[in-house]
Each structure stands twice: as structure tokens, then as C-alpha cells.
Amino acid sequence: MKILVINSGSSSIKFKFYDLKIQKCLASGMIEQIGDEVSHSKIETCDGKTIEENMEIRTHDEGIVILNRYLKETGVLTDLKEIDGVGHRIVQGADYFEGPALVDDDVITKIEELIPLAPLHNPAHLSGIRSSLRHAPCLPNVVVFDNTFYHNIPDYAYMYALPYKFYEKYRVRKFGAHGISHEFVTKKGADFLGIDYKNFCVISLHIGSGSSISATKDGICIDTSMGLTPLEGLMMSTRCGSVDPAIIPYMKRVAGYLSEDIDTIMNKKSGLLGITGTSDFRKVLERMHKGDERAKLAFDMLTYQIVKIIGSYYAILPRVDAIIWTAGIGENSAELRESVSKRLAHFGVGVDETVNVNCIKKPTDISSQNATIKTLVIPTDEEYSIAKATERILLSLKK
């Protein structure tokens, strides 16, 4: 099957086009800064053909038109009918969906209903879906949700100790995020180690501009660090992570902030950016190596928070077969992996310094010789997961 995967963000469209029959990504690209006077668009094919342009792209609909044009101009396909289906990443499906779903009016309505839970993401996802349906109405579209991996988390783990009516009326509970990535790397990790996924106990770390940690027991996720929104949990590039909620009324009272101001600060002006002035972890490391105390503080805060969550998940799992690092920082920062691992030595965690530093873009065991818990680095591939999930839905329709 040939599957087009679309990740439609608030001002961007990222895409990959797969031929799953030969297990190959034929093309990938992005359309950025949608709505700006000058937008950027690019496609690159597996055989090296590239188109890159700067122009005004006012809407996601115009972006989808450009995407379709690029697929034809690069020779990846001659007609959109060659595509078997389109898969869309959806951040928030709440408890409406237990897995991927074929797009119909009911699915669209439910994604719309969940906009209050994901006001930045779900409207953009809907724009991508509607544009895809408008320009290629003959193609089936499938939605793959970022939080269905957490569908089996027990109620005592996903509930907040707030009035129960908050949950009943407003769906206030933990939903999590990055589930597509966590599911991909945990399955990949079990396969890499030769362990049956249904007997695999693992702590997975998706550490990037957004970061989350999940605990998976016997192939079922039992807890994750993000909550009702992606703000909860670890400090991130621009998000504060978990803080005392009383900070909000306190800052309103003593500094005159509005709720909207604090929401923006906590999501877009905190985390690494709030502590150091930069959201780029690479620059944080550079500054730390030059003696910048704020950069060192941010690094130590992140290390501490990761260690603390791993420790709490170690306590709720019957055992830990592996710790898996993934995503932009997790895959590329040997220094952070080493710092965290040293603080977990009493659990039996350790990394081989040489292998850790020379880790390349493939699943790698970086454990030290004496470690009793495996430490793996596994590059995530959310788009491939979405493509495979889309394929499964489409094949089920043919039965």
C-alpha cells in the first residue's frame, strides 16, 4: 500500500509518503510558517530530488495543494489515485477512541468537540483532514491518535484528586501525549532484545522540545508523565512541566497577570527558555561548558526530573527490562543520557561511555557491561507508525 502521512500543525504541515509494500519512504517534506507573508515549503524524495520554495501560503488548504503538486512534480506519483490512503496524526482523541479510526462525519464531530482540550492542535488537524478530503475525495482518510496508547492506564493513575464532577462533566483527567512514539520504540525495543512484547517491562523517554516518560508493563502502558494537556510532567524547551498550581492565583494576585498570560508563559516562555533564555538544548550545553550557571541549573533540573520520574515508575513496575531513549534530545544527547544513568547506578543502570558517545541513527544498546537494566537508544518514527496503522484499518475494510 502507498500511504501519505500528514501531521498538520497550527502553522505547518509535515508529511511523508510511504510504499509499505517495499517498506520505503518515497518522499518527505514540510510546509512551514503558514499564514505568514513568506512561507517555506520543501519536498525531498528517496532518490534525491528536491523542490524548495519560499512564497505566501495563506491556509492549510493551499498547503495541501502544494503538497499534492510536489508529489507529482518530483515523479513520486502521476495521479493522486495512486495513493491508497491518507493517515493523520491527531494529538487529542480523549476517551472517544480506542484506536485509529476511518474518517467520517462522526469522527470529525468528535475531534471538534475535543478542541477545548487541544485548542492549538485539533483545529489544525481538522484543517488537514478537510483539505485532504476536499482535494482527493476518493481517498480514504484515517486518524491515528497520540493518546490511545494510554487507553488502559488504570483510573487511580489517570484521575486527579479534584471534585469528581470535573471528570464527569469536563473530562478532567490524564490523557497523555507522544503515545505513537512510545508505542513504536517500546515495540522496537522488545524486538531488538528478543523479548516477547507481552512480557516486556520498560520505561521509555521521549525527550525533545516536548518531553514525556511512560511506564509499560507487559506491553500495556500503565502511566505517563503528561496529563490533561502536554504541559504536565517534565520541564521542556518552552513548557514549565509540573508546578504548584497555586502559582497561578498567586501571580494573578501579586503581579496582576491574567489567566491567559500565565497560560502563555507556562507553555511558551518557560522550561529551558525560561531558565536560560534559549529553548535550544544544544545551546544550553554549549553555555554550560563555558561556565554559564543558568545553563548548568537547567541541565541539572532536567536530569533530576527525569531521574525522579524513572524512580517512581521503577516502583510501580514488577521489574524493568530496559530504559529507552528517543526523540531529538534523547537520541542525540550522550551527555544527558550519561548524567541520568549515573544517578540511577544503584538501580543497575549504566552506560558504556564509548558506545554512548558514538551512538548512531539505529537501535543501539548503550548499556555498560555490568548493567542489570538495559539502556537503549531507539530513533522514533511516528510517521511510519501512522502509515502502518492506516494500512491496518484499510486492510480491515477489505475483509
Curated annotation (Swiss-Prot):
Q: How is the cofactor bound?
A: Mg(2+). Can also accept Mn(2+).
| Transition state stabilizer (site feature) positions | H178, R239
> Does the record bear Coiled coil in its keywords?
no
The record's listing under Pfam families reads:
Acetate_kinase
Q: What class of enzyme is it?
A: transferase
SUPFAM superfamilies for the chain: Actin-like ATPase domain
A GO cellular component entry from the record? cytoplasm
| Active-site residue numbers | D146 (proton donor/acceptor)
Q: Which InterPro entries match?
A: Ac/propionate_kinase, Aliphatic_acid_kin_short-chain, Aliphatic_acid_kinase_CS, ATPase_NBD
Q: Tell me a GO biological process for this protein.
A: acetyl-CoA biosynthetic process
Residues binding ATP, per UniProt: K14, H206, I207, G208, S209, G210, D280, F281, R282, G328, I329, G330, E331, N332
- Gene3D superfamilies xrefs: 3.30.420.40
> Where is this chain primarily localised?
cytoplasm
Give the subcellular location. Answer: Cytoplasm
Its annotated pathway? Metabolic intermediate biosynthesis; acetyl-CoA biosynthesis; acetyl-CoA from acetate: step 1/2
Which controlled-vocabulary keywords does the entry list? ATP-binding, Cytoplasm, Kinase, Magnesium, Metal-binding, Nucleotide-binding, Transferase
Q: Which residues bind substrate?
A: R89
**Catalytic activity, EC:** 2.7.2.1
Which amino acids does the record list as binding Mg(2+)? N7, E382
Describe the reaction catalysed, as an equation. acetate + ATP = acetyl phosphate + ADP
- So which cofactors does this thing need? Mg(2+); Mn(2+)
Per the entry, what this protein does is:
Catalyzes the formation of acetyl phosphate from acetate and ATP. Can also catalyze the reverse reaction.
NCBIfam families, per database record: ackA
What does the sequence similarity comment in the record state about its family? Belongs to the acetokinase family.
- Give the quaternary structure: Homodimer.
Q: What is this protein called?
A: Acetate kinase
Gene behind this chain? ackA
